[in-house]
């Protein structure tokens, strides 16, 4: 029987929190490494959520961060790229690159992801396995046919943990405040709930547009 560690990615979201609990129940806390990508734009309530999850898991959650960027706004400001056909640049810089580093440094048995039992998420899991075959990904919620609403129920009624504040405010995820992949409705809600975050994003967009216009003018020989 293998004693290689199992890496479980804890995102401060409900589904990942439940997936981590299921995998600890299956393999034992000693074999599971819980890892969280921390960013500066997370809701302060996440600190409470981390501590309560750690108490239920019986072990600490490791904190990992990007060496280059503090949050999605830092990525957007420095790269001048917000979102596009290939997705948001912040996903690569704040999550994927950090995950790649852990993968390179660890001889692991599996990696655990909190994709819930939902048609869209099942297809996402299939694409993930095809795209990253060496990740050795497993999806406890899909395997156990646990949906997101069922995960919320499990978190609060089985684990005894109150849902993160962002869910209580009506958001569907808890990765960050001010998701660059959010649509107009999402950002209208951010403007009401977190006006400082909305203003920060608007400033970054204005600065990016000014820089692009200046470069276009220089390229056209306009002084």
Residue ranges and their predicted role:
Residues 1-223:
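Nucleotide-activated chemistry modules centered on ATP-dependent adenylation/adenylyltransferase
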